[in-house]
């Protein structure tokens, strides 16, 4: 689904420069809204790491999720991003070893992105027990060691598409959720009716936000 959205965006003439222009418009309207973009390292590399990060910061981006850069090769990226005040969340999956999780957490800033399930992105009807076991394990490791100077927020993503899912994740102890495929699906469904699209997106976000705020 995300890949299909990527192709559609490219066909519509969207590129990194246009994305930065869109972010700039959002930032002017919402000055306090945290904005973390997701991209591939190839874009940063081809456009000049420092140059692109600086332009991104100036447009209003607060950080990047770069899923295809391994922690063994991320020192330059993390260093340059840190100089500009950009956060660098990294991803941890259910099969990430404890030693590697410590390394990932030590290089992450802003938050740690915990992948909820094995497989690819997309909407799921339910989550397995291992999802919640892994969340508890991640919290244990982060809180029981000096991995970071202060406990880093844990955000979980992949497959979350209902308020009930959001509540389950928050009940398990995470600090936030990431929802993507559900929104992409609604954009695709109503792409010829902008008013309807915006109304549906607002309804989804509002219901997720409400579920998160209802946590004790």
What are these regions (language model features)?
Residues 23-28, 57, 78-82, 132-149, ...:
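Surface-exposed amphipathic alpha-helices with a cationic face
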Residues 35-39, 64-66, 88-92, 112-114, ...:
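Hydrophobic faces of well-ordered beta-strands that scaffold small-molecule active sites
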Residues 56, 104, 138, 169, ...:
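Conserved, mostly hydrophobic/aromatic
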Residues 1-4, 183-216:
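C-terminal helical cap(s) of enzyme catalytic domains, especially alpha/beta-barrels
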Residues 59-65, 69-73, 114-123, 159, ...:
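Glycine-rich phosphate-binding active-site loops on the catalytic face of alpha/beta enzymes
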Residues 96-106, 156, 160-177:
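Catalytic cores of alpha/beta
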Residues 11-26, 44-51, 66-84, 97-102, ...:
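Active-site-adjacent beta->alpha loops and helix N-cap segments on the catalytic face
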Residues 56-62, 80-89, 106-114, 172-176:
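Glycine-enriched alpha-helix->loop->beta-strand junction motifs that scaffold or abut catalytic
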